[in-house]
């Protein structure tokens, strides 16, 4: 806890989110913008709000987020992971419900590297019989 803020770091793909929560009225600010202005897709907004709605804290906290790297989906996942960790920092009794929903575990899937001699990570050149 930093002052009256609770902190959590979230990661997803190449995105990293630093999340600070404190008691408030439900404002979420991402990189200085309201969440609805920062994330253009409705699914991204839904992903970010999942841990708050699960724990019935949607209108309980003001949240400030700094997120870098990755694209929109990766950043939304990183923010969700950070909010989850900050909620656990605030109240450890929330951990079992968040863990059962799968929000505590970091999604370790990363982009597979491109291999030499292939078009992409696994896509080979088209085979020609003749």
UniProtKB/Swiss-Prot annotation:
Q: InterPro entries under this entry?
A: Ribosomal_Su5_D2-typ_SF (IPR020568), Ribosomal_uS9 (IPR000754), Ribosomal_uS9_bac/plastid (IPR023035), Ribosomal_uS9_CS (IPR020574), Ribsml_uS5_D2-typ_fold_subgr (IPR014721)
What this protein is called in its record is Small ribosomal subunit protein uS9
One protein family per Pfam: Ribosomal_S9
Query: What cellular component GO annotations does this protein have?
Result: cytosolic small ribosomal subunit
Top-level taxon of origin: Bacteria
Which GO MF terms are attached to this record?
A: RNA binding; structural constituent of ribosome
Alphabetized UniProt keyword annotations: Ribonucleoprotein, Ribosomal protein
């Amino acid at each position: 806890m930093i002052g009256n803020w609770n902190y959590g770091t979230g990661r997803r793909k190449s995105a990293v989110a630093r999340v600070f929560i404190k008691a408030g009225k439900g404002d979420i600010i991402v990189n200085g913008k309201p969440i609805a202005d920062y994330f253009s897709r409705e699914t991204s907004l839904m992903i970010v709000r999942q841990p708050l709605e699960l724990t019935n804290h949607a209108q309980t906290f003001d949240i400030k987020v700094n997120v870098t790297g990755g694209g929109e989906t990766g950043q939304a996942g990183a923010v969700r992971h950070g909010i989850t960790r900050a909620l656990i920092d605030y109240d450890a009794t929330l951990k079992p419900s968040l863990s059962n929903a799968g929000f505590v575990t970091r999604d370790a899937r990363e982009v597979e590297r491109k291999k030499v001699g292939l078009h992409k990570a696994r896509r080979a050149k088209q085979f020609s019989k003749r």
